[in-house]
Amino acid sequence: METVLVKQLYRETEKFAGKEVKISGWIRTLRASNKFGFIEVNDGSFFKNIQVVFGAELENFKEISKYAISSSISVEGEVVITEGAKQPFEIHAKKVVLEGKSDADYPLQKKRHTFEYLRSIAHLRPRSNAFSAVFRVRSLAAYAIHKFFQDQGFVYVHTPIITGSDCEGAGEMFRVTTLDMENPPKDEKGNVDYKEDFFGKQANLTVSGQLEAEIYALAFRNVYTFGPTFRAENSNTARHASEFWMIEPEMAFAELKDYMDVAEQMVKYIINYVRENAPEEMEFFNKFIDKGLLERLDNVVNSDFARISYTEAVEILQKSGAEFEYPVEWGIDLQTEHERYLTEQIYKKPVFVTDYPKDIKAFYMRMNDDNKTVAAADLLVPGIGEIIGGSQREERLDILEARMAELGLEKEDYWWYLELRKYGETKHAGYGLGFERMIMYLTGMGNIRDVIPFPRTPGVSEF
């Protein structure tokens, strides 16, 4: 007898109609009378459950009728088409075997639970409808990203998680050490002597793989990274996590416009791929999580993203007459309220904001001719704000060194990065997409903790 996934039965119903199959999964609901009963089974392969009908002719009918929610079972039976019924087909069971029983105190009973409560039981929340949908979409989106870049001829590069450099120059990094923190070795000045540490110097968890990706872009032309990054920011907002995933493409022989073109294509590709391959999940999100989600995503796919300079954005915000919590003036870092106003009230679609003041951007971004702004661009989307940040990289060694000196960065710490500018340097550009923010945008979920399997935030490292 053929063992099949529930997804196969839904996608190829006619093929299996009238045939005997075997499925395995977990009980979502069960109700029974004296003569027959119904079990909703989910095997994790598909968003929807499959209905199993079992009758009193089964020798273990009474035992089956008492199975608890979340018990795991195997079912053998015939696939029967049910025209006009709620479900398109069901399985008439000829054999039901209990694989593993569930205790009666199983937390996910048939009622609506808050997302906050479900975060406290992260080991069980994938079994709920909402999180079953979220993490299936997350999987599809990750695959879509790889497929997009592979089809475009990009090389996938694994950059280090443990690093000695700080890409952002922010200093908000998790330190990696094997020293005894209660009695660390000290140098002549009384400071911790990291020469005695495992790596012989200070080491941290990476905040970005960009600098290392640039190395490979200058050998392979177009590359991308996709991996975890870490920020030791004591921030408890719905948009920030201490551990998250980033997609970071780098392109040689490319300018700012090229990065924006690729980023726009990528975002549209991800949306289309998920819409096509997870229609049931997306309908669920549209109905129960964020009404209007599908319309908004369709608008993104079918529109040309707006492109405005930072200076233009500031002028628009100042002339809007809107009251913002953070006043708008040239030189500030745009806040989420400003970003959302631009995308939701002014343009009603995604917006690239370009040419930011150099003082609020990183050292590696290419200086513009005005010596006040850099060739940077952030992609802002309705409902969230920034999801992508990127720039053309500074390829001119003298200007890069001057910029580092201006910011107090030691050349010795970035000797290899500077050396790239000496051996066949070319214009190049890249960006970073926060994967979880993309998932939030795709699903309408309002908190980053609900699109990461095991969220890491200040004070939280369970599971």
Swiss-Prot record:
Q: Does the keyword Nucleotidyltransferase apply?
A: no
Pfam families (alphabetical) = tRNA-synt_2 (PF00152), tRNA_anti-codon (PF01336)
The name under which this protein is listed is Asparagine--tRNA ligase
CDD domains, per database record: AsxRS_core, EcAsnRS_like_N
Catalytic activity annotation: tRNA(Asn) + L-asparagine + ATP = L-asparaginyl-tRNA(Asn) + AMP + diphosphate + H(+)
This entry's Gene Ontology molecular function terms read:
asparagine-tRNA ligase activity; ATP binding; catalytic activity, acting on a protein; nucleic acid binding; transferase activity
Instruction: Supply the source organism for this entry.
Output: Clostridium novyi (strain NT)
- Gene name linked to the record: asnS
Record-linked NCBIfam families: asnS (TIGR00457), PRK03932.1 (NF003037)
Q: What is its EC number?
A: 6.1.1.22
Question: Could you give the subunit structure recorded for this chain?
Answer: Homodimer.
Q: Which GO terms describe its biological process?
A: asparaginyl-tRNA aminoacylation
Q: Name one GO cellular component term.
A: cytoplasm
Enzyme class name: ligase
| The family this protein is said to belong to | Belongs to the class-II aminoacyl-tRNA synthetase family.
InterPro entries registered for this protein in UniProt: Aa-tRNA-synt_II, aa-tRNA-synth_II, aa-tRNA-synth_II/BPL/LPL, Asn-tRNA-ligase, Asp/Asn-tRNA-synth_IIb, NA-bd_OB-fold, NA-bd_OB_tRNA
Could you tell me the keywords of this UniProt record? Answer: Aminoacyl-tRNA synthetase, ATP-binding, Cytoplasm, Ligase, Nucleotide-binding, Protein biosynthesis
Q: Where in the cell is it found?
A: Cytoplasm
The keyword Nucleotidyltransferase appears for this protein: no
Q: Where is it mostly found?
A: cytoplasm
